[in-house]
Swiss-Prot record:
InterPro entries: Alpha/beta_knot_MTases, RlmH-like, tRNA_m1G_MTases_N. It catalyses: pseudouridine(1915) in 23S rRNA + S-adenosyl-L-methionine = N(3)-methylpseudouridine(1915) in 23S rRNA + S-adenosyl-L-homocysteine + H(+). One of its GO terms (molecular function) is rRNA (pseudouridine-N3-)-methyltransferase activity. This is Ribosomal RNA large subunit methyltransferase H. Specifically methylates the pseudouridine at position 1915 (m3Psi1915) in 23S rRNA. GO terms for cellular component: cytoplasm. The keyword S-adenosyl-L-methionine applies. It is found in: Cytoplasm. PANTHER family: METHYLTRANSFERASE (PTHR33603), RIBOSOMAL RNA LARGE SUBUNIT METHYLTRANSFERASE H (PTHR33603:SF1). Its main location: cytoplasm. S-adenosyl-L-methionine binds at L56, G85, L104, S105, P106, L107, T108, F109. Homodimer. Belongs to the RNA methyltransferase RlmH family.
């Protein structure tokens, strides 16, 4: 079973659009243990060595929701840190240190919207792993 206390989202910048913030808050109510950090830059040195680092980037690998759930479950009891850059993306030195480059879609999304989509996919993955009716494939 996938647990939110093993997951964190680290993002550059703050959400400015109210409708995106409201959407994120709706999912946060469902997943209160999910950690979301907003900062001006990434400090990858603060991420523990045995944690999994997944960078969201347009050149990353794409998964459907079932595949993403399986991937996250395969990381067993490790903590998983998702990194979302700003409009300029994630610096290449940080991408080089990641365990996985993940693309949410072949389409390009504003970084604020990417956060909302990622949070929904995390909620969906948790629902899939719990056999909840939220995901109807």
């Amino acid at each position: 079973m996938l647990q939110t206390n093993r997951l964190s989202i680290n993002a550059i910048g703050k959400i400015k659009k109210n409708w995106i913030r409201e959407g994120i808050n709706q999912y946060k109510k469902r997943m209160p243990d999910l950690i979301i950090n907003e900062s001006k830059s990434f400090n990858i040195d603060n991420i523990r060595v045995n944690n999994i680092i997944i960078c969201l980037t347009e050149e990353g690998q794409s998964f459907n929701s079932i595949e993403l759930t399986s991937l996250l479950l395969n990381f067993k009891n490790k903590k998983i840190n998702f990194l979302i850059g700003d409009a300029d993306g994630i610096p290449s030195d940080i991408k080089d240190k990641s365990n996985l480059l993940l693309s949410l879609s072949p389409l390009t999304f504003p970084h604020e919207l990417a956060r909302l989509i990622l949070i929904e996919q995390i909620y969906r993955a948790i629902s899939i792993s719990n056999n909840s009716p939220y995901h109807r494939a």
